[in-house]
Every structure is written in structure tokens, then in C-alpha cells.
From Swiss-Prot:
NCBIfam families: aroC (TIGR00033), PRK05382.1 (NF003793). It catalyses: 5-O-(1-carboxyvinyl)-3-phosphoshikimate = chorismate + phosphate. Reduced FMN (FMNH(2)). Belongs to the chorismate synthase family. Its EC number is 4.2.3.5. FMN binds at R125, S126, S127, N238, A239, G278, K293, P294, T295, S296, S297, R319. Homotetramer. It comes from the Bacteria. Pathway: Metabolic intermediate biosynthesis; chorismate biosynthesis; chorismate from D-erythrose 4-phosphate and phosphoenolpyruvate: step 7/7. This is Chorismate synthase. Its cofactor is FMNH2. The lineage of its organism: Bacteria, Pseudomonadati, Pseudomonadota, Gammaproteobacteria, Enterobacterales. The gene is aroC. NADP(+) binds at R48.
Amino acid sequence: MPGNSIGKIFKVTTCGESHGPMLAGIIDGVPPGLSLNNKDIQYELNRRRPGFSKFTSQRREKDKVEIFSGIFKGITTGTSIGIRIKNIDIRSQDYSEIKNLYRPNHADYTYEKKYGIRDYRGGGRSSARETAIRVAAGAIAKKYLKLQHNIKIRGYLSQIGSIYCPFQSWEEVEKNPFFCSNSEKIKKIIHFIKKLKKSGNSVGAKITIIAKNVPIGLGEPVFDRLNAEIAHSIMSINAAKSIEIGDGIHVAKQTGVEHRDEILPNGFSSNHSGGILGGISNGEEIIVHAAFKPTSSIKIPGKTIDTFGKKRFIITKGRHDPCVGIRAVPIAEAMLAITLMDHVLRFKAQCGK
């Protein structure tokens, strides 16, 4: 599978499956001299890890990261950073009854048709379990971007099902298990999730990720425009179905006067473009919205076929998130950080600043 790496200079390569012994990653391109330890990475992993909220998957993984290369006396050496995370809470028996069935809306069907073989245990490589390494790599990128350029990347839940969550405060985001910034919506979300879990159903969600203090000049037109690279990274996340930058799909109903970000001596009058013009960052906040489909593994019987092409009904057991979009917040933050880190280094390599 050649699609296991992302980035040109800051390059992240991952490997591992949902029910394999571990997940691992190699991060290339980290400049030497960056102070880095397990705690820097663990904080971000703890935000993503499953099993510590009754509203997400009950698979309990500690997600303790181990750095095994690229660090000497707590400082990056400029060589490849190797990281690994052990899988501990594996229950492969939950999938024994459906190993010959294709789960609707999962990667089971396409993986087997492409490769002629698939790991049915928790989805194998196609599982969102793989994103733990992305979050670890993103933690490194976040630290470098904050220390070198004061770039801060944060995200929040902006919609779950039909519940809209207008932004209220960043302080509220870390106070609840939904990454919701609006305290007035928490009780409604809790009631909604409980109802979903009881019925065995799931729901989609929309999240918003914002990068602040991004310098002017990031992005490589024409094919590696910053918005194109961000779209690539976000859409590589499991269950991601759409991405918007700035006003996104709303630009279709705007006029030129409404949409244009007028330029004033002290900056732009608005940010409809989401911080990117001509594929290059313009110094404004980069604003990204991403929508995630409902969890495909649900306990409500559905139609499918088996590996022999015969009609079957399927109920997916196991421990699954009623809404995968919730835990996508730290994952999307990580992917935006990885993309910006790569482009910061590419800018320095080309422009020498």
C-alpha cells in the first residue's frame, strides 16, 4: 500500500492495524534542536483516545507513546523520529460472526476487491485506530509551529445531527467530551447520544478547525496550493466526506461584493476566503470545516452480501462510537498541523526566510 505517507519535507509515514500488536510511525524532517518528550505527545493522544467517555467507543486504550529514535537527551537530532503505540484492549472475537460479511459503508468490500484479502478484525488498516499515530505526529508539528511562529491550531464540534453548536468559547471546548464550545448545547447533545446508543444507531457531525498566526506565503501553486494540501490531509481521515475552507459552499449564493475581503492598511476587512488567496496563506486565520459521516458499524440489522455474493443480513457487534465526528477534532487538528509544518519548511527551503 503506497499511500501510507504524507508531506514533502515534514513527512509522516504510518503503519499498523486496529487489532495488530501496535501502531507505528516514522516522522522525517523535524529540525534539530527542538525540545521534545513523551508528555508533549501524550497530551494530544489523551484527547483522542477511546474508552474514557461513555459517549464514545468503550475500547479502552491507554495509547502510551514510545519514542524510539530521533531524540537525544530530550532534543531532536534532525534524524527520523520513530514512535509506536501498543494495542492493548483487543476483542477480535466480536468480529468472528461477520468475517465473511461485508459491512455496509465500510471499507470491507473495496479492500477485498482491490487486494484480494482483508483484515476483518475491527477493519484492520482502514480503522480509525490508525489515526493515533497521526495525532502523535501532529503533536510534534504543533509544538514546533507554536514555538517558532506562534501558530495555534484549535478545533471544536460545530454540528452533530440536527444540533447546531455556534461558537461560544475556547475554554468550554476542553471541559466536555464533545469538544463543544457552546455550554448551552451540552445537555441536548448528551440526551441525543444516549438515545442513539439505546437504539443502536449513529449520527454524522461537522467540526471546525482554526489556525491562528499563520504567516503570509505558505502554499506552492499551482498543484500544491495550501487549500488543496489541506483538503488532501483532512479528506484522508476516516469517515471524512466533505471539507470547506472559509465560507465554503456558501460562496455559491454570494455576490462578488459580499464575498471579497477588502484590503485595508491594517489588514483585511473580512475573512470569507478562510486565510488563503491564490493557494497561498494571507496572514488571516485559516478556517476549515469538515463533515464526517455516521459511524457505519451499527446494531440495527441491515442488508448486505457475503464473500460468496449471497444475500445476508448483518448486525455489527463490537465497541463503536455513536458519532465518529466527535473524536475527529484532535485528529483534524493534527492533520492541519502536519500540513502547515510541511509548508513552513518548504517555504524556508525555497525563500530562505
